Curated annotation (Swiss-Prot):
Belongs to the type-2 OGG1 family. InterPro entries: DNA_glyclase/AP_lyase_Ogg (IPR012092), DNA_glycosylase (IPR011257), HhH-GPD_domain (IPR003265), HhH_base_excis_C (IPR023170). NCBIfam families: PRK01229.1. It comes from Saccharolobus solfataricus (strain ATCC 35092 / DSM 1617 / JCM 11322 / P2). HAMAP family: Ogg. It catalyses: 2'-deoxyribonucleotide-(2'-deoxyribose 5'-phosphate)-2'-deoxyribonucleotide-DNA = a 3'-end 2'-deoxyribonucleotide-(2,3-dehydro-2,3-deoxyribose 5'-phosphate)-DNA + a 5'-end 5'-phospho-2'-deoxyribonucleoside-DNA + H(+). One of its GO terms (molecular function) is class I DNA-(apurinic or apyrimidinic site) endonuclease activity. Its EC number is 3.2.2.-, 4.2.99.18. The active site is at K128, D146. It comes from the Archaea. This is 8-oxoguanine DNA glycosylase/AP lyase. SUPFAM superfamilies: DNA-glycosylase (SSF48150). The gene is ogg. The record marks K207 as: Important for guanine/8-oxoguanine distinction.
Amino acid sequence: MLRSLVQNPKVRARVLERVDEFRLNNLSNEEVWFRELTLCLLTANSSFISAYQALNCLGQKIYYANEEEIRNILKSCKYRFYNLKAKYIIMAREKVYGRLKEEIKPLADEDQQLARERLLNIKGIGMKEASHFLRNVGYFDLAIIDRHIIDFMRRIGAIGETNVKQLSKSLYISFENILKSIASNLNMSVGILDLFIWYKETNTIVK
């Protein structure tokens, strides 16, 4: 089922094009890295489309606007959690902006799990968000376990009924290991497998 999708030339080309974009992000500057982090903050408990639209509404203001201005922009864009996420964006900016790439890239180059642990110190960033961020800046050895991935794993019989909102760290790692095994059987990294599963579940590769 998944193998045939992986072998589909058109889908594979689209996935690999997205992978190349992530690899380019790895070489990009601090602004790009913080933009990707902001996207992951916005994606938590929201759809990717809603988060991406909110990020585009904010534009360059993620780098300098105050909390009230960010909150008002998010609200005007009809983003649901405008109060909380405005606060998280400001907190992240104060905590890591200007040194995010400098601190995370050397860690991720050596140990992606260690880099993920460091990112968990940012308010609003959990296992999924940290994994998502690292994948989007060119690291592919971590799984991004959201409801679409959970649904896929449940449907193929890899896991039982699971509430994605109550996913503990240990269970996340357990599911990640299952996905890594599937990825290994398909001769790819788990972060790239994610894009194929996402396409299968949503018919898009925008994640």
